[in-house]
Amino acid sequence: MITVPAHRVKPFGVEFFQASFSAKDIDRLVKFEVLGYSGAEEPPTKVKQRANRARVNWEALEKRIGESETAYQRPVIRRKIDELVSYYRDCKDAGTLPAIPGAVIITSEKRFTFTPMASQHDLGLLQIPEEHGVLRVLDGQHRLLALHALTQAGENMGIEVPAVLFDRLDAR
């Protein structure tokens, strides 16, 4: 299990958690998956690889992305990831802006365990099964894929990723 400090929120009876993860934890725990293409829809054509400023290793990155008809995400937009890789590097160099200011939204089919602090019922420690792919991205795939690309390139960005986590959410 991985344990992170968390804030438990339960509006309208739907429980979720707010937490922060290291880039390393995100890379270990998140499964990237895009919607599969079946029936009348055609898969997106592969864009011819060209040199770019971000220098993303697309072959390695695309091996990390699964395809499923039950996935939450649309296909990956390469340009967006290239731009985010450059943005993360600029943020690191400038040291003035958070690289990921908005929370990503993550779901899991596995249950989390929340242990509240003695004095606060909504603040505590969240335990998440430590398995590759236990978390799936509902919103924020491009931000996390750009971070993954940098990690694979050997760049330690030292980024903390704010996240909203659901362990019982059916997004459909």
Regions picked out by a protein language model, each given a short descriptive name:
Residues 1-100, 106-115, 124:
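N-terminal extension/subdomain marker
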Residues 99-102, 106, 110-172:
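Basic- and aromatic-enriched surface patches that contact anionic nucleotides/nucleic acids
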